[in-house]
Each structure stands twice: as structure tokens, then as C-alpha cells.
């Protein structure tokens, strides 16, 4: 077994704070969050409704900026990126699957799988989509 303790974490948050609102209505959503998620590691994020889970995920994806602290993905500090660079970085390195996602009903299974690959710049998205559908036993459902 190798020691990966020195490896760059897939996601690293250090001292992350986020408040929303103004003045007396200001609410502290995230308070001094430190979190390291290693490559290939899976975690569960649980808590009651309104506890900041979705907000934390938005900060981790660079869709919401923390007030203080740092957020790094694949060793890249997101706070150092302007909006255009952040959008490009997200397109290459960050994916989000929302709780209620749906396939596009007017598209085939092949097209539904190929579209995000095309958006990510995959050269032969349809061939890759066929491979991925075959890998999960859905070759017969391409059309």
C-alpha cells in the first residue's frame, strides 16, 4: 500500500466562511470550514434542511465565492481565477449532478450521454458515449 498523505487533495477547503444578506439580516451560512477530499475518495454530506449543504457544494464548485478562506480543486485555488478562467476550469474539472436530474426526453440515450462529452471538448463524443453505454450494459438502448 502506498502512502498518499502527501498527494494533492481533489478538493481542499481551508477556513471557508460565507455569509449572506446585509446588516442585521446577515446570516452566517458556512463557518470556518476545513475539508480535504482525496482523489477517489467518497464522502457523505448530511444535515437538516437549511444547514448549508447545498451552499457548501456551490462554494466547492466555484459557483459561489467564499467570503474568506480558500477553495482548491485539483491543486488549483479557485479564488485566484477570474470568472472566465473559473468557467473554463469548471468545464474541464468539475461536474455536478443535481438531486433531481432528468434526461432530455426528445433525445436518444446516446445523445443524452454525448452532449456533456461534446461540451467538455471530447473529440469523438458519440464513439465515447457508445463505449460508456456499453460498459453499463445499455448498448441496446442507443436509439
Give the location of each predicted region.
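Conserved beta-strand
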Residues: 13-16, 28-38, 69, 136
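Conserved ABC transporter NBD signature motif
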Residues: 69-77
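Helix-to-loop junction immediately C-terminal to a conserved catalytic motif
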Residues: 61
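Short coil-to-helix segment of the ABC ATPase nucleotide-binding domain corresponding to the Q-loop/switch region
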Residues: 107-116
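Conserved ABC ATPase "signature" region
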Residues: 76-77, 124-141
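ABC ATPase NBD coupling module
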Residues: 24-27, 78-95, 119
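A short, flexible loop at the N-terminus of ABC-type nucleotide-binding domains that lies
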Residues: 6-10, 19-32
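The feature captures the beta-strand-to-loop junction immediately N-terminal to the Walker
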Residues: 46-48
